[in-house]
C-alpha cells in the first residue's frame, strides 16, 4: 500500500518566497532520491499564501520511516524552520488510486 505524509504549516509573513525556493531546490531533490520515494511536492494555498502543505509519497511506510531515521528529514526541516509561524502538523495516510510505483 502506498504511504503518504502531509505536513501542514504556516509561514511567517515575508518568508514565503525563500521557503518555497529552499524547499523546491534543496528539499525536494533530496527527498526524491530517497529509497522508496514516489514523489514530493509543496503546495501553497491561493487564498492564504502563508499556508503550506508538504506532501511526500512513499512505496511503503518502512521507506518513509527509513528516510526519517537517516536524519535527512530533520536536515530539511532545519533549512526551512526559520519561516515557521508555529509548529507544523504531520498526518500519515494510506493512499488509494495511485498507480503502482515501479
Question: Residue spans of the language-model regions?
Answer:
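Non-catalytic surface loops within mature trypsin-like serine protease
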Residues: 11-13, 60, 94-97
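An amphipathic, aromatic/His-enriched active-site/gating alpha helix that lines ligand/cofactor pockets
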Residues: 22-38, 57-91
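Short, surface-exposed ligand-recognition loops at beta-strand->loop->(often short) alpha-helix junctions
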Residues: 10-23
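Short, well-ordered beta-strand segments in beta-rich or mixed alpha/beta enzyme
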Residues: 2-10, 39-70
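Glycine-rich beta-strand-turn "strand-cap" elements at beta-sheet edges
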Residues: 2-3, 39-50, 76-102
Amino acid at each position: 500500500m502506498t504511504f503518504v505524509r502531509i505536513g501542514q504549516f504556516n509561514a511567517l509573513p515575508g518568508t514565503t518566497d525563500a521557503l518555497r525556493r529552499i524547499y523546491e531546490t534543496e528539499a525536494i531533490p533530496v527527498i526524491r532520491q530517497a529509497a522508496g520515494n514516489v514523489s514530493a511536492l509543496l503546495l501553497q494555498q491561493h487564498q492564504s499564501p502563508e499556508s503550506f502543505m508538504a506532501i511526500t509519497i512513499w512505496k511503503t511506510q518502512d521507506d518513509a520511516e527509513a528516510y526519517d531515521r537517516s536524519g535527512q528529514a530533520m536536515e530539511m526541516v532545519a533549512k526551512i524552520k526559520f519561516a515557521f509561524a508555529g509548529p507544523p502538523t504531520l498526518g500519515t495516510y494510506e493512499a488509494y488510486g495511485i498507480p503502482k510505483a515501479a
